[in-house]
Amino acid sequence: MIEVIYKEENPDIQEGEEGFCLPRNIRQIGVAGEKYKIYMEDYVYTFLIRLARTEENQEVQKGRVAVLTGEIKWKTGTAYLFIRGAVMAEDMEAAVDHLDFSVQVWKQIHEDQKKYFEDQEIVGWFFSQPRISMEATELLEKVHLKHFGGEKVLMLMEPQESEDAFFRY
């Protein structure tokens, strides 16, 4: 017997939402509020850890930035953020007291996104610096609201302790 289930027959799906199943190759990494769940593919997390640790052995430890790509889906009033890729912001001056998403940086990010993650949208950003506090500073919040508002997230990572945190404004 074959059972056919239509979108209209599912009482859990609200208007404007589409039904979906959670993928198996992805794990929940964070929650940014009761109605906002964050999932990230393992290879993306591994890439971000390696990116964060590239400066550990340098005398001058600058910050590392990447833009997160993926998609946001809604189910029963809850947002599910799926992070499926990350684009490193190369040649960007990044420190906890100075971040500059210049026109040139955005151009490079969009080119890489189109090349590697064409079917995905920007869903947030990543910032890492050794000995960074796991709290969003006023500068990080300003940068987030200017470039990544709405449903997008900020992921902070401290590479030496392997701590991370998510923020949404």
List each model region and its residues.
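N-terminal beta-strand/alpha-helix entry module and adjacent surface
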Residues: M1-G124, P130-Y169
